[in-house]
């Protein structure tokens, strides 16, 4: 499961990707993404240390994207904030640990299964970039805006449980 910190980082990056050459104040991102300001400060510093963001202090300053939205993939963001992507320590690539109860990794069915899960997850996260998330957001907003208000009223009436 993604941490709140990781989800907030992704939301902040998508917001910044809307105007990638702009300088953003913490308050602006906090207000737009509904992220607590103090929490966001630490997130942006982590992104800066990772080389994803740059910053300038003082008048006319703020945070900027150092990498293009197409260069920032979800695998990098998830690893930065949440560490290993795999569900079991023996299936991680960058944070490998042998499981205490494992008799033989080479024949372990749990490890074999979760290596496949990890590989598929990593590939998906690597292929999803901040740019692709912004495109998805734009598409979803467009689809939401194109819905007929009358049909959504009918759906609300029939959706009661």
Locations of regions flagged by a protein language model:
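Beta-hairpin "wing" of winged helix-turn-helix
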Residues: 51-66
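Short alpha-helical segments that sit at the start of domains
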Residues: 1-12
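A short alpha-helical element within helix-turn-helix/winged-helix DNA-binding domains
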Residues: 27-33
């Amino acid at each position: 499961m993604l941490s709140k910190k990781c989800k907030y980082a992704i939301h902040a990056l998508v917001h910044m990707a809307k105007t990638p050459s702009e300088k953003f104040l913490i308050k602006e991102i906090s207000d737009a993404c509904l992220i607590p300001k103090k929490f966001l400060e630490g997130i942006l510093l982590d992104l800066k240390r990772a080389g994803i963001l740059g910053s300038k202090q003082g008048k006319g300053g703020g945070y900027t994207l150092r990498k293009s939205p197409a260069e920032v993939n979800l695998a990098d963001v998830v690893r930065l904030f949440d560490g290993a992507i795999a569900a079991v320590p023996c299936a991680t690539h960058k944070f490998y640990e042998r499981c205490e109860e494992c008799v033989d990794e080479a024949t372990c069915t749990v490890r074999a299964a979760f290596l496949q899960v990890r590989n598929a997850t990593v590939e998906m996260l690597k292929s999803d970039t901040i740019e692709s998330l912004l495109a998805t957001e734009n598409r979803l907003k467009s689809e939401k805006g194109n819905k007929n208000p009358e049909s959504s009223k009918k759906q609300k009436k029939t959706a009661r449980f």
